[in-house]
Amino acid sequence: MRLQFAPYILKFKEPAGTSRGVLTEKITCILRIFDENNPTKFGVGEAAIFPGLSPEADDRFFYKLMELQANIRIGKSTDLLKFPSLQFGLEQAIRDFTGGCHGIYYESPFVHGQKSIEINGLVWMGDFDRMIERIEQKLSSGFRCIKLKIGAIDWSKEVEMIKYIRDRYDADRLEIRVDANGGFDMDNVLPRLKRLADMGVHSIEQPIKAGTPALMRFLCEVSPLPIALDEELIGKYTREEKLNLLEEIKPAYIVLKPTLIGGYSGAQEWIDLANEHGTGWWVTSSLESNIGLNALAQWVATLHVEIAQGLGTGALFVNDFESPLYLEGDRLNYNPGISIDREAIDALDWRE
């Protein structure tokens, strides 16, 4: 067997505001695995490394990738525990290859166009007027759950924005989730959590920065608003580390990003532990291209989820790959008549 990789720069249709600044492009790494006796038949995956978040987002990534290539040639396993995006990309490529190289990563009614996945409508950070415009677009499209990235503009403006939504839609009709990306501090977090709870917000992701478990546990104990851990999960590699986090902090929810926590296998371990401890969860994409997003959605469709998931829609980038995924209202669907364009993938800058 052989493994090749192709670095690829995804270009945003419009600047995307995040807690880490404004993004205009994002690097990713496409993988393909094949039998050298039949190189035209290959399994495809994506290692969607995320600078600033992925624990392996430095020179180690490409050194580990070359080690992985060498080991695959001789049939030797590679320890990818601390390289979650590579783990996820390799899992995808192997599943595609063993499934016949048709872009089917998980067999389910979803890939036959018979079921769909409810997702939240993500509203990116921006100035007040732009965010209100984006909210209106999501509401008119039929979303029943929206997620707001907060922490980029003045707090009073963010409160005004949420109040604007609540004045039109009560909590029974529209669920509002917010993601602070660690943007609050201990001087302001408690009154802000109370204000959000008073406005009927469903939950908040990562109100303070990751890495202070005692403070986060305190917040989870006293907050009137359910707290979901996000960045806090990154870097917890073993089952014991994951279990300790859930038992120490006791969050209401965890947010699972397979690209950042070890792929299908790493995320499934979190799910199993969360279910054992009565912790809620949902799955979120992490700026993957349509290759990774397709592979992620197919897995989520097998989980029998009952709440809105945080999956992307493939509409962020101008140079993305063709995808069988499409949106109807707030439901992500799969068109079995469309598959990833393997000729376009074959034309990438592949490296040995």
Regions found by a protein language model. Give the residues of each.
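Shared catalytic-loop signature of beta/alpha-barrel
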Residues: 63, 215-217, 222-226, 231-338
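Short, acidic/polar
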Residues: 126-138, 187-191, 237-247
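Catalytic beta/alpha-barrel core
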Residues: 124, 146-155, 177-182, 200-212, ...
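Short, well-ordered coil/turn segments that N-cap beta-strands
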Residues: 113-119, 142-144, 171-174, 200-202, ...
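N-terminal capping/lid subdomain adjacent to the active-site entrance of alpha/beta enzymes
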Residues: 1-176, 181-183, 197, 322-352
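N-terminal active-site wall of soluble small-molecule enzyme domains
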Residues: 107-108, 174, 178-198, 211-222
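General beta-strand structural signal in soluble alpha/beta enzymes
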Residues: 4-5, 45, 148, 176-178, ...
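Active-site-adjacent beta->alpha loops and helix N-cap segments on the catalytic face
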Residues: 128-129, 152-168, 184-188, 208-221, ...
